[in-house]
C-alpha cells in the first residue's frame, strides 16, 4: 500500500526514562533564513519542551538524518552520535499515524496546497486549491516525503504543535520549518517511529 516498512533499522539506544535530555548551548540558528521577514509565527509561545534546542541524543544514524518520534511529538536532526537538534512537531491524529523510512524527494518555499481526493471526501468544505502564503495550512516551507502525500511542513496554527491533529503530515512552527529546510537537502533520510 503506502510503504514497505521492513527497511527500518533498530531503534536508537534508549536512555532510562528518568534521564532528561541535556541541553547544550550550541548555535541552533541556520544561516540565511529570510532575516527580517515575519513568517507568521515562531516558537515564542510554545511550551519549553517543543522549542527548538540542541539535546543529548544517541543515534547510530549519520549526521543529517531526520528521526521523527510521533509519541514524543519531536523531530530530531542528527548532528553526531550523541547530539541532535530537536524541534517540536504536530503529528497525525488517530487513524492517520504511520511509521517507516523515506527520503525528502522535493522541497518548496511557500508551497501551494491541493488536498488529496481522500481528504476532500472526508472534509468536503476544504478548498480544492490554496496558493502558498501566510494563510496556507502548509506554512512557509514543505519537504515532501518519498512519493507519498506526506510532508514535513510549516503551519499557520502554531497552537497545534505537540498535538495529534494532522492527516499524517508533520508540522512545525514556520520559523522552525524554515530553519530545518535550510539544513536538509533533497535526499535526506527520514525515519518515522511510533514506539
Task: Indicate residue ranges for each PLM-predicted region.
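N-terminal pre-domains immediately preceding structured catalytic cores
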Residues: 1-195
